[in-house]
Design a protein with these regions (language model features):
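Beta-strand/loop substructures that line and gate deep hydrophobic ligand-binding cavities in soluble
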Residues: 87-142
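Hydrophobic/aromatic beta-strand elements that line small-molecule binding cavities or substrate pockets
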Residues: 9-11, 70-76, 101-109
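Hydrophobic ligand-binding cavity/cleft-lining segments
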Residues: 1-52
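Hydrophobic pocket/interface hotspot
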Residues: 20-24, 60, 74, 85, ...
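Short acidic/polar mixed-charge low-complexity motifs
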Residues: 3, 66-68, 112
Length: 157
C-alpha cells in the first residue's frame, strides 16, 4: 500500500473564526471554485445534495467543467474549528492518479481574524502514479491559494 500525500494551504482572513466557519461550510462550491488553475478545472455544479450542507453523513456529487465528477461526503463538523470530508468515485482527468481524498477545512484564531487552512490527504491509485504527484501537488497548491483568495473576498466583501 502506498503512503498518502498531504497537501495544505492557509490564508489569514480578517473575520472571526465563528463567522469564517459559519459562512464557509454552506458556501456554494461553484462560487468558491470558479476559476481554472492550469489543468485543474473549476466546479460547474453540485448534484444530489439534500438540504443545507451542514451535517456529517451528507453526500453530494461535484461536477467539474470538462466533465469529471466526484462524490463528496461530509465526515465531521466541529463548529467553529473544522469540518472534514472524503472525496471518492473520482472520474475525469484525476481518476488515473487519485483513488480518494480526505479533506479538511480548519479555522484557527489568528490575531483579530482567522487562519483558514485547506488540507487534502491524497490516496493515489498506485505506486505507478507516484511520479506525477509532485506536479499535481504544485498545481493543487496554486489552486488552493486562488480558492482561499476567493474565500477571503467572499468573507470580507
Amino acid at each position: 500500500m502506498t503512503r498518502p500525500v498531504v497537501l495544505e494551504q492557509s490564508r489569514a482572513i480578517p473575520v472571526a473564526p465563528e463567522e469564517a466557519f459559519a459562512r464557509t461550510l454552506p458556501m456554494p462550491l461553484p462560487t468558491l471554485f470558479r476559476q481554472w488553475y492550469g489543468p485543474i478545472p473549476p466546479i460547474r455544479a453540485i448534484r444530489d445534495q439534500t438540504g443545507e450542507w451542514e451535517r456529517a453523513g451528507q453526500s453530494r456529487t461535484i461536477v467539474l467543467k470538462g466533465g469529471g465528477t466526484m462524490r463528496e461526503t461530509l465526515t465531521s463538523v466541529d463548529a467553529p474549528k473544522s469540518f472534514g470530508y472524503t472525496i471518492t468515485g473520482i472520474t475525469g482527468p484525476m481518476a488515473p492518479l487519485i483513488d480518494h481524498v480526505e479533506g479538511a477545512w480548519i479555522f484557527t484564531p489568528q490575531g483579530t481574524g482567522t487562519r483558514v487552512t485547506w488540507r487534502w490527504t491524497l490516496h493515489r491509485k498506485s505506486a505507478l502514479t507516484a511520479p506525477a504527484l509532485p506536479v499535481f501537488a504544485r498545481l493543487w497548491r496554486g489552486y488552493a491559494r486562488q480558492s482561499l483568495e476567493s474565500l477571503s473576498d467572499h468573507l470580507v466583501g
